[in-house]
């Protein structure tokens, strides 16, 4: 089931601009390995779910997958062949706003080689460029 907020204050949001790099959510916290976004963009809830399924099919209960992004922005669209005007369209899908440096997924309980293969499968589903990162031991 695709992720979406339980309830929101406003159903329709403005598109906005994605400026700068991520200052929060840019370090591996829960797992041992992660994938980090190198581009800015929107990631649909269905895309997040497709990535989750691809990763979990590969690890098969060995490791634990953590999803670090949540689709909290509603993206609206008007029906095809509709004339201009008549207000803003209805919410079409939910998306997560991702900045460069944001950690998208984390993985624990697997070897580094397994994590790299798993994230390579997952990266093919993502609309942004990503890279493999490890947890830094302080």
Curated annotation (Swiss-Prot):
At the top level, the lineage of the source is: Bacteria
Q: Does the keyword RNA-binding apply?
A: yes
Which parts of the sequence are annotated with region: Disordered? 1-21
Which Gene3D superfamilies is this protein grouped with? Ribosomal protein L10e/L16 (3.90.1170.10)
Listed under GO biological process in this entry are: translation
GO CC terms on record? Answer: cytosolic large ribosomal subunit
Instruction: Report the InterPro entries cross-referenced here.
Output: Ribosomal_uL16, Ribosomal_uL16_bact-type, Ribosomal_uL16_CS, Ribosomal_uL16_dom, Ribosomal_uL16_sf
Q: Does the keyword Ribosomal protein apply?
A: yes
Q: Name one GO molecular function term.
A: rRNA binding
Bias (Basic residues): 1-18
Q: Which UniProt keywords apply?
A: Ribonucleoprotein, Ribosomal protein, RNA-binding, rRNA-binding, tRNA-binding
- Read off the NCBIfam families from this record: rplP_bact (TIGR01164)
- PANTHER family cross-referenced by the UniProt entry: 50S/60S RIBOSOMAL PROTEIN L16, LARGE RIBOSOMAL SUBUNIT PROTEIN UL16M
- Subunit structure as annotated in this protein's UniProt entry: Part of the 50S ribosomal subunit.
Q: Which family does it belong to?
A: Belongs to the universal ribosomal protein uL16 family.
HAMAP family the UniProt entry points to: Ribosomal_uL16 (MF_01342)
Purpose of the protein: Binds 23S rRNA and is also seen to make contacts with the A and possibly P site tRNAs.
Which protein is depicted?
Answer: Large ribosomal subunit protein uL16
- Organism of provenance: Rhodopirellula baltica (strain DSM 10527 / NCIMB 13988 / SH1)
């Amino acid at each position: 089931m695709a992720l979406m907020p339980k309830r929101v204050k406003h159903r329709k949001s403005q598109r906005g601009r994605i400026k700068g790099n991520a200052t929060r959510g840019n370090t591996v916290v829960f797992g041992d390995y992660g994938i980090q976004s190198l581009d800015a963009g929107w990631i649909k809830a269905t895309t997040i779910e497709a990535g989750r399924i691809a990763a979990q099919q590969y690890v098969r209960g060995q490791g634990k997958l953590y999803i670090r992004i949540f689709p909290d922005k509603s993206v609206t669209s008007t029906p095809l062949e509709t004339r201009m005007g008549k207000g803003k369209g209805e919410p079409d899908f939910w998306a997560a706003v991702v900045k460069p440096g944001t950690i998208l997924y984390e993985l624990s309980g697997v070897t580094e080689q397994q994590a790299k293969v798993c994230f390579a499968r997952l990266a093919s589903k993502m609309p942004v460029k990503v890279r493999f990162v490890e947890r830094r031991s302080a």
